[in-house]
Amino acid sequence: MSFETSKTFPAESRYTSNVNAGAYRAYELESNPRAASKTLRMLEAAASEFYAATADTPELLREAYRLRHQVYCVERGFEVSDSGLECDEYDDHAPHVVVRRRYDDEVVGTVRLVLPQAAKPGFGLPIHSLCASDLGHRVALRSTGEVSRFAVSKERRGLSSEASQLLRLALVQGLVRMSAEHGITHWCAVMERSLLRLLRSSAINFEPVGPMVEHHGMRQPSVCNVSSVLQQMRVEQRIIWDFVTLGGTLWRDHLTTATHERRGFKPAYAA
């Protein structure tokens, strides 16, 4: 599967039922095989409803901005725009991922990765306009991207908890892909604690880099090392790691697909 060709991940990246018995035998070695099997079934079932794509056309970007307006302006009380779109100056240097519903292609989730701009103060990352942090002393800003506008609308979310989790994981998969493509080694963010907790449940752990700040609610400036996060995820949440990295193919300094297959688990994506 490749963003370079189709710019989407429909059939070839979806979790489908082509997982053989060897997958389950491999996961019997996990510390909690029952939970592992439940996670696998959840991903298989929920991924039949959604797919992720890069927002690489004006039309898809407008859909992302429209969803952001629904989430941040209508639902969370940001200033409402007459255009019905929520966008800002950071979008000019931020690739986006959207998650779409398969049966009608409606955009139900989006996230952007604000890329560093060496010629701008603070490398052009929004975190520096919102708070004082020691981010620049912790990581190399030239390879740090800011995770921002992580949005799934309540209005469009008449979803099971499993589907909601898949939406988040599909967005994280997009972040991993974009980070690999743009040489990003660290993510920073200014997030609500509730979102940080949800990410932590999938072994995505951010560390604070400053005190809580008020920005349309209290938020925590945070940072993480992408490689470290994925290494921890591979140990603690192997099935989720396989989904988020496409069996290790999206982040090459981890376990390779070939090694993964020798354990008896093949990435569960239709070719």
Model-based region annotation:
Residues K38-E86, D91-Y103:
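Short amphipathic alpha-helix that is part of the acyltransferase structural core
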Residues P33-L40, D134-G145, L230-M233:
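Acyltransferase donor/substrate-recognition loop-hinge adjacent to the catalytic core
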Residues G109, L125, L255-A258:
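Structured alpha-helical
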Residues V98, D105-L115:
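Conserved beta-strand in the GNAT
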Residues E4, F9-P58:
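Conserved N-terminal entry element of GNAT/NAT acetyltransferase domains
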Residues G210-R262:
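Accessory, usually C-terminal, subdomains that scaffold auxiliary metal cofactors
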Residues P121-V226:
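Acyl-donor binding region in acyl/amide transferases
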